[in-house]
Each structure stands twice: as structure tokens, then as C-alpha cells.
From Swiss-Prot:
Signal peptide range: none
Gene Ontology cellular-component terms listed: chloroplast
UniProt catalytic activity: [ThiS sulfur-carrier protein]-C-terminal-Gly-aminoethanethioate + 2-iminoacetate + 1-deoxy-D-xylulose 5-phosphate = [ThiS sulfur-carrier protein]-C-terminal Gly-Gly + 2-[(2R,5Z)-2-carboxy-4-methylthiazol-5(2H)-ylidene]ethyl phosphate + 2 H2O + H(+)
Keyword Glycoprotein: no
UniProt name for this protein: Thiazole synthase
GO molecular function: thiazole synthase activity
Function of the protein: Catalyzes the rearrangement of 1-deoxy-D-xylulose 5-phosphate (DXP) to produce the thiazole phosphate moiety of thiamine. Sulfur is provided by the thiocarboxylate moiety of the carrier protein ThiS. In vitro, sulfur can be provided by H(2)S.
UniProt KW keywords: Chloroplast, Plastid, Schiff base, Thiamine biosynthesis, Transferase
Length: 277
């Protein structure tokens, strides 16, 4: 049975919903939980974003818990948000599989007993943080067989994106530019190819620095956007979260409305006939 997941206070926009697995979400903006100055700022920003899906690094959350520190797993109301555990910090497929299993247990303890989502990250490169395509494919294939709803973070590689779709991944999440860099849309052609060739949702993840960039990929036909650093590192994080929310909605509406045809000549909007001179 399909389940709908939305915030009670979500504005009733004329937006089609986003389906991932058997879950339906009203917001196409997903947000992260890292790099905020404090928990209060993070919670306020997540609220302002209007996001349904919030991703949490399982390794970081577990370390905070072991040290007795407060973290967003305790601070957020998970009856109103859908947690997307991620395998950030994993350098191999085997490590990612172990962390994914831990993540599934954690979300069940938070009350989301039907949550099998995992944002798969396999990143052996500590400098540029580019994901390992071979390790990602290997881990994804195993996790899909184990019943996970796999959402892999990948480079902007159309061939890999299609392979991940073919083995049963629920989405693909190609980067726009290096994670946390704010460099913006450096792979537009490849992103466009991935979007055009995909039969599953394409969520643009990493590198987006401004709302205009989020709107641009949504106009291209992306299914959604995941933003963390651009919000968390903004001087006014809650305000930037709201701006990203509006940009994603605007971009999606633009895509579904359709762009006007570009003309090579001018075309006046006011009539030039029938007016006395």
C-alpha cells in the first residue's frame, strides 16, 4: 500500500508529489543535518525548509550518542519527518553495508519501523570526496537484495546511473560539483543526460550553493534536490532554507508548465494594428 508523507502545515501548492519506493512526499527539497553552528539553528532551518526528508550520517550520530552528546536524532520530531540515514564516512562497499544495517536499526528505534531507506555513500577519496563507482555499485546490489530502498550518491556518470537503476535502486543522486564546495552546476550536460535517460527519480546532491542553482536543475527535470552546506553555512541559515524551498518549488512548476519557445526575432506583446496614429 502506498503511504503519503507530508507535513500538516505544508502549503497546498499545485505540485505533483515525489514517490520513492512506496512512500509519497510533498516536498522535493531534502536537507542534511551537518555543519550547523548549533542544534537550535539546525532545527529551525529544517523547519523553514519545509522538507519531508532529512538525511543523517549514521556514523556521526552514533559517535555523538556514544559520547553522551545531544544530536539531531534526539532533537527532531520524527513523527513529522522521514529520516534518510546515510553511510557518510565509509570508504569501502563492505563498510557501507555494515553502516546501512546499523542505520536501519536506529530508524526503527525512532519509531519508523517501515523505513528501509538508505543514502549510500562510498567515498575513499578524502580530498575531493568523489564517490567510488565500483564500490557504490557493489554495495547497492547487495543492499537492494536485502530489501533496502537504496539512494546512491554518485558522480555525474550517465552509464553508472543507468546500471544502478537496472539493479533496482530507488533513485540516483548525482553530484552537481564536489560535496560541500558550493561550486554550483559544473556537470550540467551529464546531469541532463542522466535526467533524460532515467526511469527513477534523479535527486541532485552536492555542490549546490544558491537557490538559483537549485531552481535550474529542477527546471531541467530533476525530481528533487538535497542541500546541506549551502543552508548550514549561510550567515542566516533559516532564511536560506526558506529560499531553497521556494526555489525548488519554482523550478518544479517551471518544468511542469513548460518553457516558451525561443524565437530568433522580437515579437511584440502589444498589438500594432487597429490603433489610430
Amino acid at each position: 500500500m502506498k503511504q503519503s508523507f507530508s507535513r500538516p502545515h505544508f502549503e497546498n501548492q499545485e505540485l505533483d508529489s515525489l514517490k520513492i519506493g512506496e512512500k509519497i512526499f510533498n516536498s522535493r527539497l531534502m536537507v542534511g543535518t551537518g555543519k550547523y553552528n548549533n542544534l537550535k539553528e539546525a532545527i529551525k532551518s529544517i523547519d523553514y525548509s519545509g522538507a519531508n526528508i532529512v538525511t543523517v550520517a549514521i556514523r556521526r550520530a552514533q559517535n555523538s550518542k556514544n559520547l553522551g552528546r545531544s544530536n539531531l536524532l534526539d532533537g527532531l520530531d520524527w513523527s513529522k519527518l522521514w529520516i534518510l540515514p546515510n553511510t557518510a564516512g565509509c570508504e569501502s562497499a563492505e563498510e557501507a553495508v555494515r553502516i546501512a544495517a546499523l542505520g536501519r536499526e536506529i530508524v526503527k528505534k525512532l519509531g519508523q519501523t517501515d523505513n528501509n531507506f538508505i543514502k549510500l555513500e562510498v567515498i575513499p577519496d578524502s580530498h575531493y570526496l568523489f564517490p567510488d563507482p565500483i564500490g557504490t555499485l557493489k554495495a547497492a546490489e547487495y543492499l537492494v537484495k536485502k530489501g533496502f530502498i537504496v539512494m546512491p550518491y554518485i558522480g555525474a556518470d550517465p552509464v553508472l546511473a543507468k546500471q544502478l537503476e537496472n539493479i533496482g535502486c530507488a533513485t540516483v543522486m548525482p553530484l552537481a560539483s564536489p560535496i560541500g564546495s558550493g561550486q554550483g552546476l559544473k556537470n550540467l550536460l551529464n546531469l541532463k543526460i542522466i535526467i533524460e535517460n532515467s526511469n527513477i527519480p534523479v535527486i541532485i546532491d552536492a555542490g549546490i550553493g544558491t537557490p538559483s542553482e537549485a531552481a535550474k536543475v529542477m527546471e531541467m527535470g530533476a525530481s528533487g534536490v538535497l542541500v546541506n552546506t549551502a543552508i548550514a553555512r549561510a550567515p542566516n541559515s533559516p532564511q536560506m532554507a526558506k529560499a531553497m524551498s521556494l526555489a525548488v518549488k519554482s523550478g518544479r512548476l517551471t518544468h511542469t508548465a513548460g518553457r516558451m519557445i525561443i524565437n530568433q526575432t522580437a515579437n511584440p506583446s502589444s498589438p500594432i494594428f487597429g490603433i489610430s496614429k
